Amino acid sequence: MGRWSGFRWLYEIGCGLRVGNRKAAIRAYRDLGIVVGDSIANAITLLDTITVIGGGLAGAHSLFLKHVVDEMNNPLLNMNGEPAQRLEMKAYNLEDVKELDEFLRGETKVITIPGTNKTITHDPLKRTGVGISRLGTGKAVAIGAYAYALSQLGEA
């Protein structure tokens, strides 16, 4: 779990690998997921991107990532107490095989271009994804820098 290893004990308790109050550890990660999900939902309104959780926190994703995405998809209540869609898009847990498949599949439709016999493929599903880093920051930066250098040389 990298630099975040100071909290590895909590992860291990939550997974049943260490003696402790497993229910409390799982609840702590659920609460973390809700807070992180709320923060990402607020930030994602400014950005058109997927979210990648990295560092040591990524190692504990099995205990909180579902709660992050659930919170992002939860509606907010308006002044009348009625639910209002929080995000313009649907958030997907990219670490869940079923959700990843749905994210990648989308809702592709073939539509006719008005005034012609031509058709185009269109995917109207607005979506974002939340996943974890597998490369690590140093390697990801190095790969990005290399790709950028190649593009500047005209070799990419």
Which residues does each predicted region cover?
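ATP-binding/phosphotransfer module of carbohydrate and carboxylate kinases, centering on a glycine-rich
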Residues: 1-156
